[in-house]
From Swiss-Prot:
Sequence intervals crossing the membrane: 214-231
GO molecular function (one): unfolded protein binding
Principal cellular location given in the protein's record: endoplasmic reticulum
Name of this chain's protein: Protein rot1
GO cellular component, one term: endoplasmic reticulum membrane
Record carries keyword Endoplasmic reticulum: yes
A Pfam family the protein falls into: Rot1
Keyword entries, A-Z: Endoplasmic reticulum, Glycoprotein, Membrane, Signal, Transmembrane, Transmembrane helix
Protein purpose: Required for normal levels of the cell wall 1,6-beta-glucan. Involved in a protein folding machinery chaperoning proteins acting in various physiological processes including cell wall synthesis and lysis of autophagic bodies.
Family: Belongs to the ROT1 family.
Entry-listed glycosylation sites: 52, 130, 136
Transmembrane helix among keywords: yes
Residue ranges, Cytoplasmic side: 232
C-alpha cells in the first residue's frame, strides 16, 4: 500500500477546518461533473459511469466515513491526440487529527481503477485500487463560497474543490465488494471493460499545453506502481 502526502496552502481568507463538521458534505472541482455516489461508480454491476468532464470529488460524513472519485486525463507527449483516461474510486474511514491533518484509510477490497489508452487497446484495464492518503485541511470561504484548497507534499497546488452537496452524496459506507479467503471477489463480474470513448474530446489544445492542467500526472504515475490486479 502506498501513501500520498499532501499539505494545504492557506490563502489570506482561509480558515482551518477545526472540526469534522467543517468537512461534512460533497466537494467537487470546478466542472462539478465528477461527484461521488451512484452517478460515478455502480457497485451492483461493478462498473464506472463516465462523466462528461474530468474532475475530482471527495465526500465526508459526520461519523468519519469518506468517499473519493477521480476522473483524469493524462497527456501523451508522443501523440497529443491520444491522452489516457483514468477513473478511480475509493471509500473508507477518515480521522481528523488535532494538528489539522486528515488521514484517509480505504476499504482495501472496494477501491477500483480504470485506465483507458484508446490508441493502444480497444479495452480498458480494470483493477483493484487501494491507497491510503494523508492531508492537511482547511477551508477558504472566499466571497462566502465554501472551498477546499489542497497542496501536495512538494507544495504544488491541487485543483480547488467546492461544496456541492450537504448532506453528502455517497454510496453505502459498508464493504461493497467483499473477498473470500482466497482473496478473490465473492461477486463474479465481467473483466472485459468498455473503453472511455469520450476521453479524446475532454482535452482541448490549451489544456494539453498548460502544465497547471497536469498536476496529477506524477501522482498517478506513482499510484500505478502500487496497484494489485483485479482477478476474477
Amino acid at each position: 500500500m502506498l501513501a500520498r502526502y499532501f499539505s494545504l496552502s492557506l490563502l489570506a481568507t482561509a480558515v482551518s477546518a477545526a472540526s469534522i463538521s467543517d468537512l461534512v458534505g460533497t466537494w467537487s472541482t470546478k466542472s462539478r461533473k465528477v461527484v461521488t455516489g451512484p452517478d460515478f461508480y455502480d457497485p451492483i454491476n461493478d462498473k464506472f459511469l463516465e462523466p462528461n468532464l474530468t474532475g475530482i470529488s471527495y465526500s465526508f460524513t459526520e461519523d468519519g466515513h469518506y468517499e473519493e472519485a477521480y476522473y483524469r486525463a493524462v497527456a501523451n507527449p508522443v501523440n497529443p491526440s491520444c491522452p489516457k483516461g483514468i477513473m478511480q474510486w475509493q471509500h473508507g474511514k477518515f480521522v481528523l487529527n488535532s494538528d489539522g491533518s486528515l488521514e484517509l484509510t480505504p476499504i482495501a477490497s472496494d477501491g477500483r481503477q480504470l485506465v483507458s489508452d484508446p490508441c493502444s487497446s480497444s479495452l480498458a484495464t480494470y483493477t483493484r485500487y487501494n491507497q491510503t492518503e494523508t492531508f492537511n485541511v482547511s477551508k477558504d470561504p472566499y466571497h462566502g463560497i465554501q472551498r477546499l484548497d489542497l497542496k501536495r507534499f512538494d507544495d504544488s497546488p491541487m485543483h480547488p474543490m467546492y461544496l456541492v452537496y450537504q448532506p453528502p452524496q455517497m454510496l453505502p459506507t459498508t464493504t461493497l465488494n467483499p473477498v473470500s479467503e482466497t482473496g478473490k471477489s465473492k461477486r463474479h463480474v465481467a473483466r472485459d471493460t468498455d473503453r472511455l470513448p469520450g476521453v479524446r474530446n475532454l482535452i482541448t489544445k490549451e489544456e494539453l499545453t498548460n502544465p497547471d492542467r497536469w498536476l496529477w500526472v506524477g501522482v498517478f504515475a506513482t499510484a500505478l506502481g502500487g496497484i494489485t490486479l483485479f482477478y476474477s
